[in-house]
Structure formats: structure tokens, C-alpha cells
Amino acid sequence: RIDEENCCLIANGNIIKVIYANNPDEIDYTQYDINDALIIDNTGSWRDEAGLSRHLQSKGASKVMLTAPGKGNLKNIVYGINHDQILPEDKLITAASCTTNAIAPVLKMLNDKFGIESGHVETVHAYTNDQNLIDNYHTGNRRGRSAALNMVLTETGAAKAVVKAVPELAGKLTGNAVRVPIPNVSMAILMLNLTTPSSKEEINEFLRLIALHSNLQNQISYTQDPDAVSSDFVGSREAAIVDSTATIVEGNRCILYLWYDNEFGYCNQVVRMVFKMAGINYRQYPEEG
């Protein structure tokens, strides 16, 4: 419920204070008994070190996480792949994008097992608030067209961003995106040329075992449902779900279809990173090592 008098949201008995400010460095968190705050910036307004550092000028602020690909030398982290790079002294971290989080774990595992010579990532992505609901002006030409009425061809930085988490894929991937008129759940199509020839059965079994028995259980899930459609994956906690019935393999050529809840699934990745940055460590099964 909403507590307008105290400017709060109350969810399951938890009080969530709403703080208004024009700039990130105007807030005094200690006024609200908040010290050593870990700030999650999902505005997208500041994506480099200089911009995000403005948060740290606020009294009571300690660390900042950006929920978008960062620019410059910021650490771009995909939890499950390179989260061990987060150090206690790090003040600014980025959680990459929902698409990067969806594709990086699968690409990492495939490259380790079979090798990836080259590939293309095509995302069929639910529309976002960056698009217009009706035809109107936009800095990106196609994104100015009505999001609710069109499939919109646009760019994605996910293929390049993957390299910051999986550097061995540098120069091997291209990417593009098609925004479609649904509110949530997207699909990444991985079209890969592998170093080692394989088969549909081998690739699927490899990914199934990873989803069941590896340390990437929270990042990679697996479905054999022949009737699966996008709405089935609303609320999925994993970063991506492999649609095994759609897998295509011909020798060195492999095409994979990954579903992902680009909202809730990504939020779960962000929460895992928050725990890491805050030093909160729950026991994981299977245990690492």
C-alpha cells in the first residue's frame, strides 16, 4: 500500500522510503538512518565513472551499482561468470544488461567445451520505455515508431558487452535486436560456428547437465516443453532458459534459442550482485570447489 503522509511504500510489512531529489549528490541518507548505502542506479542517466561517482558525494552513500552496461573502465559483471572480480574496495560496479546476463553464461560454457569461432546474437526483445507508444520523435529513428504496433529493428550492445565478461570471445560476435509489442520476456537467438563439430543431442545434454548440476544453476535453466511460449517464462528467476526443442546443430553450425524474463530474471541477477558487494554469503548447492 501507499503511505502518502510519510512518503512510503509498504510491501509485505516492509517500509520502503521514497526520496525525491533532482541530482544524486543532493541526498543525505543519514537523515533516514541509512549508513554505508549501496545505491542501485537504474535511471540510465549516468553510465560512466564521473557520473556515477556523484552518488558517492551523498552523505551515507558507500557503493554504487549500475543496472546497464557501463562505459570506460568500469567493471561490467555478469553474476556467475566474472563476479569473482568484485573486490571489497570496489565502489562502482555495473551489472551489464538483461540480454548480456542471458547470453554470457551459455556462451561461456559452449566456448569452454566446443570452442566458438564466430557467431551472431539476435534478440527478440519486449518493448521498453525507451520507445514511443505512438509515432513520435526519437533520437533513434526506428525507436520513434509505435512500440505497441510494430516490430522495431534496432541495435543491441550485448554482443560487445559479453566480451567484458568473457574476453576470449573478443571480435567473434555481432548482434542486433528486434523489439516486439509484448510487455515482458524476450528471446536471444545464438547463431554460432563452433570449433568442434557436435550434434543437437550432445549440445542439449551438455546444457541440461549444466542447468542441473553446475554452479550456474541460477543462470542457466532448461526446458523440453514443445508447447513453450513467451508468457510461460514470466517470473523466471534464472538469467536464461534453453529451449532445447528448438536447438539446431549441423556439424560446426549451432543455433540456440534462449528465453529470458528481461525484468524479473535480470533483477535476480542484480540481487545476487548486491549480496556479493555487501558481503552477504549464503551457502550454495552444489558447493563451489
Predicted regions mapped to residue ranges:
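Acidic active-site catalytic centers that drive phospho-/nucleotidyl reactions
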Residues: 41, 189, 261
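C-terminal substrate-binding/catalytic lobe of Rossmann-fold NAD(P)-dependent oxidoreductases
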Residues: 1-30, 115-118, 123-254
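A generic structural signal for alpha-helix starts
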Residues: 101, 197-198, 264-265
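NAD(P)-dependent Rossmann-like dehydrogenase/reductase catalytic/cofactor-binding core
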Residues: 234-289
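Generic alpha-helical structural context detector
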Residues: 108, 164, 208, 272-275
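N-terminal Rossmann-like NAD(P) cofactor-binding subdomain of oxidoreductases
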Residues: 1-133, 137-144, 248, 272-273, ...
